[in-house]
C-alpha cells in the first residue's frame, strides 16, 4: 500500500468515525434519557439544531379548567424540564426563549414524557420580537444633557422648568406619565401602525395623534405638558429607527436560581378591566388565608373586585355598591380619538376607584376607595363600607393594627372593632420639620413654601405615594414623588418629620438618582428599600448619616452616605451615561418571612417594564420573568405560606397583571388580566 493510499484510507476512516459520532449524537438527542416525573407532571428534553437548549421556557397552557391556566418552567443546563403538579386537563405545550421563535404547540396530558424541538430564530429581528419591553424602550435617545435647561416653545420645545436630562427621563417614566400606566416598548407602543403612517407621513404628527387615542387620550395628551410637545420628536425618532431595522441588545437567558422558578397564571376579570393590585395574605403573618382566595381590585375600569380560588382554578367578580350616585366618574368619559380596538366606546365606567387591598390578621381584606374603605370578608362572603375610614391611595398595617394611609392619616382597627365608631377610630398626625433642631415640634411652623427661618420649625404634611410602618420604632416612612423626590420619616410620638432625598447632583456622591415610587423596610434592621426610577434599587440606612438629622442644614441632600444604589438589570437609555436602567418600578417589597424561598428580608423589585419581578440576593439579581403572554406589568406584590411543612410547594410570591391597557399585551383586545404566582424550586427538575 502506497503512502497516498494509506492517507486516503485513513481519511475515509476518520470521516466514517466522525459520521458515526454525529449520527449517535443525533440519536441521543432524539432518544434523550427520560426525566423523572409523577402522574401529574410533564417532563422531557428541549433540543434544537444547536443541541440541548438551556435556560429556555416551557409553557403549558389549558382552557379546560374553570379559568384559563398557564404554568411555565425553565430548562436546566442539559435542556431538561419538568412542569410539576398540573391539574387534570389537556395542555398545549411549547418552547419560548431568547434566540428562538416559538415552537409548534403540542397537545398532551400530565404523566407524559414530551421531548420538544426548539426553533432557532431565523434572524435577529425575529428573535427580538420576544424581548421584554424595556429592552426596546432603551433604544429611545433622550435629549442630550446640553439641551437642558429647556428653552421652551420657541427653542427646543422642552419647558424651561426641566433643568436636567434626569428630570426629562423621570417624567417619561413614573412621574405621572407613560410607564405609570402601561409598558413602553411593547409592539403596540414602539411601532407606528401602517394606517397611521399613511395618514401622517411625519412621525411627529403620528405620535401627536396616537397620544390622544382611546379612553386615556385626554390624560396622555395632558401628561405631555411637563416635558413639552417638542419632546414628541424623540419618540418619533425612536419609532423611525426601529422601523428602519434597529434592534435592542439581547437579554440574557435565565441562569442559576432563575432556572428554578415556576410561574403559574390564572385568568380573571375581563378584557377591558384594569386590575391595579392584589393581595394574598397578612404580610405580618403570611400563613393567614392559607390556600385561600387571592383578591384583586379593579380600579377606574369599574367598581369591582376580582377573586381567584387557586385550588379550584376558578374566579369570580364582586360588584361594589356606590353609595352616592352623584359621585363623579373616576376617569374621563370622553374619547378624543377613536381607539383602534374599542372605537368610540367608553369602556371604563367606575366611580369608586378601588386602589389598594391589604389583608388583616383575620384574613379580611381592607380596600381603599374614593369614598373611604371597603372591608371584604372571604369566609363570610360579605363586603361592607366602613364609614369614617380615611381610604384614598395605599395602605399598610402597623403591628398594633393601625392602618396607615398614603394621605398621612390612620385608622385604629382595634378601636373600631371595640366601639363600631369609624369616625372616632380615624386620625391624623400634625407634624413639622425640626428646622431649629431643638428635638421637639414647635407649632405653628413657618409656611412650607416660604423662606427658611433657622429659629423656627417648618410646616409639613405627612404622607406620600407609598408607605411602610417601621416595627422597630413605630415611625412611618413615605415615598414622595418628584425629581429627585424624597422619602420622609414621621415619628407619631414626637410629631417630627424628617426628609431624605436620594443623592442628586450631590458633590458628595458619585451617582445621581431620583424618583422614588415604592418603599418598604427590612424588618430586622430598619433599613429602608426604595425603587428609584432613575433605574436603581436603593437602600437607605438612617444609622449611617454622619451629620445632624434635623436642624437648618438637614434640607434633604444632607445624608448621601445613607444611600446605597444598586443598578437594576437591563440596558439604560441609548446615549445616557451613568448607571441605571430604562426599566420602571411601580412598587417594591421586602420578603419579611421567606415566602419566596430566598430568605427572610430579601428585597424585591417589581420590573414593571421588563415582564418580571426581581430579588436582590446577596447583592446579585435573580430575575423572575413571565415570558408568556408578553407584556406582563406588575405594580405591587406579596407572598404567602400555605403550608410551612410542604417545602417550596407550600409557599410562593403573588402578584397580578396590572397593565392599564390590557389590550397592549400579547393576545390583543381578547387578552384578560391574570393572577400570578412565583415559586422557587431547589432545582429545575424538582417535581
Stretches with model-predicted labels:
Residues 175-186:
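The canonical Cys-X-X-Cys-His
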Residues 538-539, 630-687:
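Blade-level signature of beta-propeller repeat domains, shared across WD40, Kelch, NHL, RCC1
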Residues 62-68, 90-111:
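A short, solvent-exposed loop/turn motif at the edges and junctions
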Residues 293-297, 364-368, 402-406, 475-479, ...:
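Conserved beta-propeller blade signature
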Amino acid at each position: 500500500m502506497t503512502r497516498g493510499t494509506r492517507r486516503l484510507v485513513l481519511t475515509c476512516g476518520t470521516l466514517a468515525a466522525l459520521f458515526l459520532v454525529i449520527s449517535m449524537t443525533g440519536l441521543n438527542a432524539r432518544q434523550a434519557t427520560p426525566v423523572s416525573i409523577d402522574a401529574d407532571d410533564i417532563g422531557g428534553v428541549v433540543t434544537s439544531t444547536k443541541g440541548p437548549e438551556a435556560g429556555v421556557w416551557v409553557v403549558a397552557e389549558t382552557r379546560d379548567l374553570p379559568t384559563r391556566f398557564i404554568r411555565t418552567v425553565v430548562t436546566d443546563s442539559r435542556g431538561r424540564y419538568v412542569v410539576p403538579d398540573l391539574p387534570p386537563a389537556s395542555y398545549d405545550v411549547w418552547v419560548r426563549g431568547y434566540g428562538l421563535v416559538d415552537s409548534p404547540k403540542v397537545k398532551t396530558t400530565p404523566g407524559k414524557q414530551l421531548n420538544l424541538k426548539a426553533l432557532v430564530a431565523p434572524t435577529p429581528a425575529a428573535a427580538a420580537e420576544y424581548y421584554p419591553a424595556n429592552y426596546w424602550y432603551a433604544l429611545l435617545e433622550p435629549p442630550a444633557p446640553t439641551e437642558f435647561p429647556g428653552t421652551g416653545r420657541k427653542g427646543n420645545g422642552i419647558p424651561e422648568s426641566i433643568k436636567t436630562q434626569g428630570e426629562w427621563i423621570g417624567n417619561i417614566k413614573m412621574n405621572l406619565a407613560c410607564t405609570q400606566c402601561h409598558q413602553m416598548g411593547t409592539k403596540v407602543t414602539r411601532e407606528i401602525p401602517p394606517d397611521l403612517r399613511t395618514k401622517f407621513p411625519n412621525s411627529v404628527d403620528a405620535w401627536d395623534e396616537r397620544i390622544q387615542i382611546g379612553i386615556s387620550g385626554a390624560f396622555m395628551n395632558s401628561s405631555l405638558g411637563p416635558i413639552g410637545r417638542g419632546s414628541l420628536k424623540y419618540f418619533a425618532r425612536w419609532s423611525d429607527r426601529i422601523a428602519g431595522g434597529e434592534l435592542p441588545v439581547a437579554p440574557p437567558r435565565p441562569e442559576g436560581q432563575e432556572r428554578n422558578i415556576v410561574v403559574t397564571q390564572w385568568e380573571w376579570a375581563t378584557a377591558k378591566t384594569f386590575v391595579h393590585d392584589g393581595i394574598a395574605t397578612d404580610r405580618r403573618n403570611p400563613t393567614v388565608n392559607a390556600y385561600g382566595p387571592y383578591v384583586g381590585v379593579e380600579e377606574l375600569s369599574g367598581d369591582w373586585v376580582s377573586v381567584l380560588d387557586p385550588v379550584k382554578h376558578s374566579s369570580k367578580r364582586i360588584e361594589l355598591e356606590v353609595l352616592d350616585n352623584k359621585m363623579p366618574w373616576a376617569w374621563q368619559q370622553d374619547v378624543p380619538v377613536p381607539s383602534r380596538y374599542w372605537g368610540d366606546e367608553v369602556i371604563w365606567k367606575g366611580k369608586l376607584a378601588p386602589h389598594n387591598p391589604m389583608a388583616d390578621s383575620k384574613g379580611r381584606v381592607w380596600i381603599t376607595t374614593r369614598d373611604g374603605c371597603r372591608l371584604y370578608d372571604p369566609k363570610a362572603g360579605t363586603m361592607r363600607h366602613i364609614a369614617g375610614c380615611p381610604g384614598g391611595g395605599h395602605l399598610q398595617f402597623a403591628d398594633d393594627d393601625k392602618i396607615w394611609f398614603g394621605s398621612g392619616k390612620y385608622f385604629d382597627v382595634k378601636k373600631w372593632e371595640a366601639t363600631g365608631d369609624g369616625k372616632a377610630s380615624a386620625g391624623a398626625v400634625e407634624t413639622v420639620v425640626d428646622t431649629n433642631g431643638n428635638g421637639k415640634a414647635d407649632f405653628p411652623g413657618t409656611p412650607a413654601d416660604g423662606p427658611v427661618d433657622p429659629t423656627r420649625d417648618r410646616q409639613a404634611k405627612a404622607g406620600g405615594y407609598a408607605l411602610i410602618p417601621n416595627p422597630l420604632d413605630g415611625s412611618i416612612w413615605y415615598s414622595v414623588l418628584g425629581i429627585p423626590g424624597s422619602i420622609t420619616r414621621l415619628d407619631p410620638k414626637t410629631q417630627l418629620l424628617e426628609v431624605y432625598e436620594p443623592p442628586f447632583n450631590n458633590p458628595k456622591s458619585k451617582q445621581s438618582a431620583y424618583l422614588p415610587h415604592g418603599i418598604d423596610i427590612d424588618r430586622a434592621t430598619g433599613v429602608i428599600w426604595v425603587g428609584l426610577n432613575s433605574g436603581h434599587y436603593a437602600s437607605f440606612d438612617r444609622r449611617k448619616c454622619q451629620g445632624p438629622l434635623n436642624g437648618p442644614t438637614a434640607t434633604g441632600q444632607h445624608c448621601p452616605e445613607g444611600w446605597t444604589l444598586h443598578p437594576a438589570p437591563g440596558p439604560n437609555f441609548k446615549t445616557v451615561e451613568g448607571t441605571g436602567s430604562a426599566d420602571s418600578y411601580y412598587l417594591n417589597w421586602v420578603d419579611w418571612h421567606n415566602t419566596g424561598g430566598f430568605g427572610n428580608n430579601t428585597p424585591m423589585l417589581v420590573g414593571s417594564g421588563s415582564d418580571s419581578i426581581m430579588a436582590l440576593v446577596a447583592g446579585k439579581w435573580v430575575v423572575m420573568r413571565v415570558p408568556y403572554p408578553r407584556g406582563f406589568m406588575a405594580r405591587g406584590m406579596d407572598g404567602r405560606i400555605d403550608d410551612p411543612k410542604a417545602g417550596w410547594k407550600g409557599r410562593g410570591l403573588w402578584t397580578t397583571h396590572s397593565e392599564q391597557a390590557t389590550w397592549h399585551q400579547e393576545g390583543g383586545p381578547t387578552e384578560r388580566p391574570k393572577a400570578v404566582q412565583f415559586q422557587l424550586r431547589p432545582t429545575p427538575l424538582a417535581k
